[in-house]
Amino acid sequence: MVKIGNISLPNFPLLLAPMEDVSDPPFRRLCKMNGADLMYTEFISSEGLIRDAIKSRKKLDIFDEERPIGIQIFGGDEEAMAMSAKIVETVEPDLVDINFGCPVKKVVCKGAGAGVLKDVDLMVRLTKSVVESTHLPVTVKTRLGWDHDSINIDEVAERLQETGIKALAIHGRTRAQMYKGHSDWSHIARVKANPNIEIPIFGNGDIDSPQKAIEFKEKYGVDGIMIGRAAIGHPWIFNKIKHYRETGEFLPEPTIQERVEAARNHLLWAMEWKGERTGILETRMHYTNYFKGCLLYTSPSP
């Protein structure tokens, strides 16, 4: 069993990563139905929450069938992060997560997300401000460092643990890599092997198959795995990994009917959540994802 504060997860839990414009309630619900053990919301701007921005507030929507679930916040100001943690607390998630890993320029330029990777002292202050502002368990998601020449995840892990965080998810790339190249889990393994590290360490990056998930578990010794892009349009990946781990066998690929049903449920739940017009418009971007790598046959014309 893996513990995050008062949250109990199964051995080697599978986490759904927070993804902007992806990890909304309808998609999270699909992933939960298909084996995700812990999920996170899309990241939410601390400044947006304080301004009571509609988009930011809407991202606070969570539902009991999703639990355990964490709400992820980002920002570069200590006071704003503390205030946003208190706002998050009002909707009663299971935990609060801090984003120190988003590499997108518009976030980094605000001194948030991966923008703080060059200033560990600031990371510590921001984290401490959140930990001290909430009774909920606080976790962090980050990257190896700013670039190859400034990998500092070992220092970051120890210092953030000292602030009181309850778990750390590490993406195996630097900010400079964005999502290019390959993730390097050797640094994640080194953090996990550090005798001073007592909190759960979750690995993230390039897990796209049951074989790779189990290979990385055995090779790098992480407590669990966080899955992001590989779950887009394929929420079945969680149960596929679990089945392979338990039996050594592969589950069959989802049928056309199962893919259609997933896309249909995504649409229906989006409409229930945001209304018919918005639900339809926002779900359109997801339809094709459910049919990637799938050949669709039509009857030949007479």
Regions found by a protein language model. Name each.
Residues H234-F250:
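C-terminal helical cap(s) of enzyme catalytic domains, especially alpha/beta-barrels
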Residues L14-A17, M39-T41, I69-I73, V96, ...:
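Hydrophobic faces of well-ordered beta-strands that scaffold small-molecule active sites
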Residues F100, G172, V222-F238:
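Glycine-rich phosphate-binding active-site loops on the catalytic face of alpha/beta enzymes
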Residues E20-D21, F74, T142-D147, P200-Q211, ...:
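Glycine-rich beta-to-alpha transition loops that act as phosphate-gripper elements at the mouths
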Residues Y297-P302:
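Conserved small/polar residues in nucleotide/adenosyl-binding loops
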Residues K86-V96, K105, K110, L122-Q177, ...:
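Alpha/beta enzyme core
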Residues M1-G5, P10, M19-D94:
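Glycine-rich, positively charged N-terminal anion/phosphate-binding segment
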